[in-house]
């Protein structure tokens, strides 16, 4: 079955659940809850990357993320850290993290070095047009798929030239990161072209504004649209879906997997 990556935002200002898990105790409780709900990976982030979000200092992000990683590794589930800062990457890996999930696709100075020098961590390279502060004010122009494919291929190649094996790399088309509603759904409709590149595909539609644009639902009301988008992403080749609502997504994927199984003997 495709993997579910559960989101743990250790931030006061995330667009969906800001401040709910902004301290060590509440963050760990949320990690434990997501694990009980069936998450396969925990994705811990200490800086909001919602449209318009302001950067946080290196010191603040380290204080938010590293203590949670050190405790979460005891849960015996793969730990991903959502960061673009090389110093946070290194500290997280030293604390026991397994995956670096970078919205900048290792374009920050020193990021390629951190990941390439680590012997075993996984890395997810995401496409983002512009930067969080202004990416939705100036979204990309034209068709998204060709630009996203070219960018992700270039970033993956840069990493492999540093000696990182292809098996350690996953790609993320970056839904909602500098793209229009039409471009986001273009990425979903033609996601098979990304899957054909031969890398595991990680996709995050959870509670995104494009879902609200189509359905009229506010952020807190986007459970059903989020699960529907996750299922469509999986149907089109995503191996990992990054979500807030782990339990509902796991249940939906269980039904999806069961329906596809030719070995099922269950009868109504």
Report residues per predicted region.
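Extreme N-terminal starter segment of soluble prokaryotic enzymes
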Residues: 1-4
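Active-site-adjacent loop and "lid" segments of alpha/beta metabolic enzymes
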Residues: 15-30, 49-67, 71, 75-78, ...
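Catalytic domains of carbohydrate-active enzymes, especially glycoside hydrolases
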Residues: 29-45, 237
């Amino acid at each position: 079955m495709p993997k579910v990556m559960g989101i743990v935002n250790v931030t006061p200002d995330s667009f969906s659940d800001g401040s709910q898990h902004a301290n060590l105790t509440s963050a760990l409780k949320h990690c434990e809850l997501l694990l009980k709900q069936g998450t396969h990976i925990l994705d811990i982030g200490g800086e909001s990357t919602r449209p318009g979000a302001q950067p946080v200092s290196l010191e603040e992000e380290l204080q938010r993320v590293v203590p949670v990683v050190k405790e979460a590794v005891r849960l015996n589930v793969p730990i991903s850290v959502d960061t673009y800062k090389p110093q946070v990457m290194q500290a997280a890996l030293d604390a026991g993290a397994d995956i670096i999930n970078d919205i900048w696709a290792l374009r920050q100075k020193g990021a390629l070095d951190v990941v390439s020098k680590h012997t075993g961590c996984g890395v997810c390279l995401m496409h983002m047009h512009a930067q969080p502060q202004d990416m939705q004010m100036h979204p990309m122009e034209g068709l998204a798929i060709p630009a996203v494919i070219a960018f992700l291929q270039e970033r993956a190649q840069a990493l492999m030239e540093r000696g990182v094996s292809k098996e350690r790399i996953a790609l993320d088309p970056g839904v909602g990161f500098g793209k229009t509603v039409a471009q986001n759904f273009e990425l979903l409709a033609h996601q098979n072209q990304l899957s054909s590149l031969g890398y595991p595909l990680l996709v995050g539609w959870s509670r995104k504004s494009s879902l609200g644009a189509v359905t009229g639902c506010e952020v807190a009301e986007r459970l059903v649209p989020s699960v529907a988008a996750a299922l469509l992403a999986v149907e089109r080749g995503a191996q990992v879906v990054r979500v807030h609502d782990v339990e509902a997504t796991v249940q939906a994927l269980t039904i999806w997997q069961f329906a596809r199984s030719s070995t099922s003997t269950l009868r109504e």
